């Protein structure tokens, strides 16, 4: 899995002008699923995300997790994280998982996250508009195959 984590003051995702999910303080996750991803990748990503200390404590140090601040997650599927830009000027997305597998793993990922924090989400495969107010900004890239 490839994920982009953005610390936000607020974020929302809309489809056809209607809000599908919205959060206040927390994390916006852009989630890409690869063809070789499995339950271990999901567990690793969930463990990292819910325990990562990227929120400020009373002294202004990044020392608190999303659980500590009782924050929320907005999860948005994004196969374009698997873009291959080596040839030409049009990205290829053949490195992303097929939609059936990706949808299944994305759903499972969100269900596992929801065991720890409130999770709002977009709609898998939909054309979505994402709005956010970055906090920091703090943006972290997580690749479950690089640990």
From Swiss-Prot:
Any Gene Ontology biological process: D-amino acid catabolic process
Record's subunit section: Homodimer.
EC number: 3.1.1.96
EC supergroup of this enzyme: hydrolase
Protein name as catalogued: D-aminoacyl-tRNA deacylase
A GO cellular component entry from the record: cytoplasm
Family as reported in the entry's similarity comment: Belongs to the DTD family.
HAMAP family assigned to the protein according to its UniProt record, in alphabetical order: Deacylase_Dtd (MF_00518)
Transmembrane segments: none
Protein origin, superkingdom: Bacteria
Entry text on domains: A Gly-cisPro motif from one monomer fits into the active site of the other monomer to allow specific chiral rejection of L-amino acids.
Classification via CDD domains: Dtyr_deacylase
Catalytic activity: glycyl-tRNA(Ala) + H2O = tRNA(Ala) + glycine + H(+); a D-aminoacyl-tRNA + H2O = a tRNA + a D-alpha-amino acid + H(+)
Function: An aminoacyl-tRNA editing enzyme that deacylates mischarged D-aminoacyl-tRNAs. Also deacylates mischarged glycyl-tRNA(Ala), protecting cells against glycine mischarging by AlaRS. Acts via tRNA-based rather than protein-based catalysis; rejects L-amino acids rather than detecting D-amino acids in the active site. By recycling D-aminoacyl-tRNA to D-amino acids and free tRNA molecules, this enzyme counteracts the toxicity associated with the formation of D-aminoacyl-tRNA entities in vivo and helps enforce protein L-homochirality.
